[in-house]
């Protein structure tokens, strides 16, 4: 085992202090976890009643369909086995670049940093990290010409919770106080 110690000035006994630190037993930090309670999907904001399917229409490629719900949400579903264990989700909302003034500068490049890491409801980024730890879930934000978008690549075991995470973000975005 080798170690390198780089300091701003030479002090007597540094080699011995480094050797003692490396030989000391490792102890888990008692203050590393900020909360004793595990974060679960039940900690996300609660929604109202689920919408019902109003129509299902085949579109485009075989297996692709457009689904309209009673709350106005539209879903384009393309179930296929082209990518094993992958579920791609793209949620479009709002008006994207069209929502901004053509004459005033807008820092739309900061949308991902400001909106995604800002939390959901009362959950901050740390709680969201705990919630998604060990799962294939994500939340990328982008601004298109005609819509804002949330994207993620997940897997069959996690896609329902991924959709719930997106819905919660749109329903009750939070602001992480950090």
Model-derived regions: residue spans:
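M16 family metallopeptidases and their MPP-like homologs
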Residues: 1-7, 82-116, 120-172, 178
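Proteolytic maturation boundary segments
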Residues: 1-94, 98-101
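Short, polar/charged, Gly/Pro-enriched helix-capping and turn/loop motifs at alpha-helix termini
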Residues: 36, 176-177
């Amino acid at each position: 085992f080798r170690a390198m110690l780089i300091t701003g000035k030479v002090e007597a006994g540094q080699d011995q202090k480094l050797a003692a630190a490396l030989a000391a037993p490792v102890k888990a930090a008692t203050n590393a976890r900020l909360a004793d309670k595990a974060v679960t999907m039940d900690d996300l904001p609660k929604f109202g009643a689920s919408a019902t399917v109003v129509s299902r229409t085949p579109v485009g490629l075989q297996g692709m369909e457009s689904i309209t719900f009673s709350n106005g949400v539209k879903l384009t579903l393309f179930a296929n086995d082209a990518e094993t264990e992958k579920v791609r989700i793209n949620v479009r909302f709002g008006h994207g670049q069209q929502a901004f003034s053509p004459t005033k500068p807008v820092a739309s490049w900061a949308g991902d940093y400001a909106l995604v890491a800002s939390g959901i409801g009362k959950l901050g980024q740390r709680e969201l990290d705990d919630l998604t730890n060990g799962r294939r879930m994500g939340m990328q934000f982008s601004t298109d010409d005609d819509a804002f978008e949330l994207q993620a690549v997940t897997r069959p075991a996690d896609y329902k919770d991924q959709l719930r995470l997106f819905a919660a973000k749109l329903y009750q975005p939070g602001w992480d106080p950090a």
